[in-house]
């Protein structure tokens, strides 16, 4: 990478990000702007993918809401996310868990790692 670009992006990287992987259940506290108000919305689900590197890295979180699958993609280093909590650690053997989209109920469960 160009040293100039690298030096500019190093100052924007966040250091308060916990380590999490696909298969982990996370609780993302995202800032939502509605008109002139700003509030925190919690989105809890399973991380199904992590993509990119450096400042452009992002992750996809999937949850089931009222029987409908909802996925949101968050950049890791965005100021719009106040904090990320890891609720549980999952044991999976894939880096991308897109196959969970086709599974329902107990088949979509992920084995938990005790830490």
UniProtKB/Swiss-Prot annotation:
**UniProt keyword annotations, A-Z:** Ribonucleoprotein, Ribosomal protein
What Gene3D superfamilies does UniProt report for this protein, alphabetically?
Answer: 2.30.30.790
Top-level taxon of origin: Bacteria
Q: GO MF terms on file?
A: structural constituent of ribosome
Pfam families from the entry?
Answer: Ribosomal_L19
List the InterPro entries.
Answer: Ribosomal_bL19 (IPR001857), Ribosomal_bL19_CS (IPR018257), Ribosomal_bL19_sf (IPR038657), Translation_prot_SH3-like_sf (IPR008991)
Q: Which GO terms describe its cellular component?
A: cytosolic large ribosomal subunit
One GO BP on record is: translation
Which protein family is it in?
A: Belongs to the bacterial ribosomal protein bL19 family.
Free-text function comment from the UniProt entry: This protein is located at the 30S-50S ribosomal subunit interface and may play a role in the structure and function of the aminoacyl-tRNA binding site.
Q: Which HAMAP family match?
A: Ribosomal_bL19 (MF_00402)
Query: What is the name of the protein in this document?
Result: Large ribosomal subunit protein bL19
Species, as recorded? Streptococcus pneumoniae serotype 2 (strain D39 / NCTC 7466)
Q: Which gene encodes it?
A: rplS
